[in-house]
Amino acid sequence: TGEKPFTCKECGKSFKTKQILCTHELSHTGEKPYVCIECGKGFYQKGHLNVHSLVHSTKKPFICTECGKTFIVKQLLHEHFLIHTGEKPYACPECGKLFRLKQLLTSHLLTHTGLKPYTCPECGKRFAFRGNFYQHLHLHTGDKPFSCTECGNCFATKVQLQRHHLLHTGEKPFVCTECNLSFAGLANLRSHQHLHTGEKPYKCTECGKCFRFKGHLTSHMKIHSGIKAFICTECGKEFTHKYSLRKHQRIHTSEKPYVCTECGKSYKQRRSLNDNLRIHTGEKPFACTECNKTFLSASCLQAHKQTHTGLKPFQCNECGQLFSRKGNSNVHLQSHTGEKPYTCAECGKSFTTKVTLNHHRYTHTGKKPYPCTECGKCFRQKYELRCHQYSHTGENPFECTECGKSFPSRARFNRHRNIH
């Protein structure tokens, strides 16, 4: 009949039988009566324990004919195979959005009801999904129970560990059908695909800025609130987002968890590692629609686009100078504050940027990593090499708007400009 007379008092969800209701209620109490004798993990239902027990068995009889991946149970193979077919059989009755799995649809439906049955006892924040609730609890406890067997790094969730592990394996199973670029995570692929479609469906009600993902919009909204809840215990600097604090703290700890498998160079940010990997592959996937010039990273493309528009949206609050890139604006700001957070371990000299510090280090090592392909002369900085190459090509790209004279380097152009 479809009747569901048994209702959960905690969240209002209804069930056909009292037994199913009792099993569901365990999700609110946290009780897990079915315990695995191999690893001690607990489960709400006996069926879930039975499926879990297969994890300890090395037998994976169900094989994907597309990619060869093996699975413990047939249901997991069926769910996996939908990735290859692109089939999404479960449709949301509210908005028509399609999903591969029934549980993904069930989770999505909560976004329409607004129901958030899971409340954090520490801060009162409410969650629609139990997984998100447990993940949030780790913020208060600091618990990171999932450890990488390769490097020992610990993570709050299993998903974070799995994503991290791909750095070691180099596996990128998600391929863009437009340009054949491959990605380690499905979310990364979806983010990339928006570059092809140009779609940015999430709009900020404060300033009108649009975003590809709801998470990016939520993160952006904190800028308008002005709240900076995350404080560095080393220097007291405040941040709007936790990931910004984490990234900043690596300045103090010198931690560089992202290591290039090609050259061994390590980075503080995953994005920097990805940019470095493209140097090895020669890949430049980001193309300018104006002149077709290609770039290693989206940020380089974005900066280049402003050479066509002349737009300089970042203004210094101290002196009013305008910049086309936020990074350049931040570096310039340090000329007012006097802040120099990057210190040379050899001589103690401090610098405003990491790039400047790295260039300075070459004065101690004598290293000149940038050779000219024409004459073999080597340079400490890529910029110096580029200026030198103009002596071979005869190119003078820096032109004075006052008198029309042109120069091979910005430094010589700036010296000349002072004459006017």
Curated annotation (Swiss-Prot):
GO terms for cellular component: nucleoplasm. Transmembrane segments: none annotated. Its main location: nucleus. Pfam families: zf-C2H2 (PF00096). Keywords: DNA-binding, Metal-binding, Nucleus, Repeat, Transcription, Transcription regulation, Zinc, Zinc-finger. One of its GO terms (biological process) is regulation of cytokine production. Signal peptide: none annotated. It comes from the Eukaryota. One of its GO terms (molecular function) is DNA-binding transcription repressor activity, RNA polymerase II-specific. May be involved in transcriptional regulation. Belongs to the krueppel C2H2-type zinc-finger protein family. PANTHER family: GASTRULA ZINC FINGER PROTEIN XLCGF26.1-LIKE-RELATED (PTHR24399:SF54), ZINC FINGER AND BTB DOMAIN-CONTAINING (PTHR24399). This is Gastrula zinc finger protein XlCGF58.1.
